[in-house]
Regions:
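Short segments within alpha-helical structural elements
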Residues: 60-66, 97-101
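Glycine-rich phosphate/cofactor-binding loops in nucleotide/flavin-utilizing enzymes
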Residues: 71-119
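C-terminal helix-coil-helix/basic helical segment that borders enzyme active sites and/or dimer interfaces
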Residues: 19-51, 65-73
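Alpha-helical transition-metal enzyme core signature, strongest for iron centers
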Residues: 14-25, 50-60, 86, 90-93
């Protein structure tokens, strides 16, 4: 299987996706550990890092399931657990809508905690 061009393409996509996640997480973690004051921009940095990591993990695990086929859905497969974890990360607070709402409000100078949240 490793010599099949489609499998190689899928593996390359997975590797590049994972490589893109780490630098953002490392930067946010380092800034947090060093007490860097990003003010309200912390919302963008923290929510953005979580969102990108979860979306990237989902893409990688979904592609891995495509490559492995049906055997990846069984409990004995480590891909099954990774698939479940990655999928649940997408709905764990904050989900897609909430993440986008908070990031956009902060970027637009709107206090995300100020009522009303919508309207």
């Amino acid at each position: 299987m490793a010599h099949h061009p489609e499998v190689q393409h899928a593996i390359a996509e997975m590797v590049m996706e994972m490589e893109a996640i780490a630098p953002q997480l490392d930067t946010v973690a380092e800034d947090w550990s060093n007490g860097v004051d990003h003010g309200h921009a912390w919302v963008i940095k923290l929510v953005g890092a979580k969102y990108r990591a979860v979306e990237g993990a989902w893409k990688v695990v979904d592609a891995a399931l495509d490559v492995t086929g049906g055997s990846g859905i069984f409990k004995k497969s480590p891909i099954e657990r990774l698939w479940r974890d990655a999928r649940l990360g997408k709905i764990h607070p904050g989900n897609y809508a909430l993440s986008h709402e908070f990031v956009a409000k902060v970027a637009l100078g709107i206090d995300p905690d100020e009522p009303p949240r919508w309207g």
